[in-house]
């Protein structure tokens, strides 16, 4: 009985093992597990794509809002400049009327009144410009940058006006 040697029994064991694997539907379970994993990966990819698109939409929206804010800031600055020009023109007109009405006064009093009027106009223009700059900086910069820029601007305004 040569066919009853160890090789034969190993072969029979292999055949029985393979039959058991097929009987227990292991290949089907493996295929189902792989299909489930593929579905999970597909769902994760779809979710990632959806999140990316949502992020793109948010980015576009925030860029639009930033542009609107910049345009509004530019409008505010332009309005402040126009108002400063009007105030300057109005102050100049008042100063000229004051000087014309007071020609009988001495030359020293006229010069003193002009100096005071110019300082008042400059002070009002500086206050308006600083307020506009504060508004713009409050919208655009963080606290540290705002503080630094404000300090520099005030120093420059003081040196130029004095």
From Swiss-Prot:
Q: Which domain of life is it from?
A: Bacteria
Keyword tags: ATP synthesis, Cell inner membrane, Cell membrane, CF(0), Hydrogen ion transport, Ion transport, Membrane, Transmembrane, Transmembrane helix, Transport
Q: Which PANTHER family match?
A: ATP SYNTHASE SUBUNIT B (PTHR33445:SF1), ATP SYNTHASE SUBUNIT B', CHLOROPLASTIC (PTHR33445)
Q: Which Pfam families match?
A: ATP-synt_B
Q: Which CDD domains match?
A: ATP-synt_Fo_b (cd06503)
Q: How does it assemble?
A: F-type ATPases have 2 components, F(1) - the catalytic core - and F(0) - the membrane proton channel. F(1) has five subunits: alpha(3), beta(3), gamma(1), delta(1), epsilon(1). F(0) has three main subunits: a(1), b(2) and c(10-14). The alpha and beta chains form an alternating ring which encloses part of the gamma chain. F(1) is attached to F(0) by a central stalk formed by the gamma and epsilon chains, while a peripheral stalk is formed by the delta and b chains.
Summarize the protein's role: F(1)F(0) ATP synthase produces ATP from ADP in the presence of a proton or sodium gradient. F-type ATPases consist of two structural domains, F(1) containing the extramembraneous catalytic core and F(0) containing the membrane proton channel, linked together by a central stalk and a peripheral stalk. During catalysis, ATP synthesis in the catalytic domain of F(1) is coupled via a rotary mechanism of the central stalk subunits to proton translocation. Component of the F(0) channel, it forms part of the peripheral stalk, linking F(1) to F(0).
Its source organism is: Rhizobium johnstonii (strain DSM 114642 / LMG 32736 / 3841) (Rhizobium leguminosarum bv. viciae)
Q: Where in the cell is it found?
A: Cell inner membrane
**What sections of the protein cross the membrane?**
3-23
What is this protein's name? Answer: ATP synthase subunit b 1
GO molecular function annotations of the record:
proton-transporting ATP synthase activity, rotational mechanism; proton-transporting ATPase activity, rotational mechanism
Q: Does the record carry Cell membrane as a key word?
A: yes
Q: What membrane topology does the annotation report for this chain? A: Single-pass membrane protein
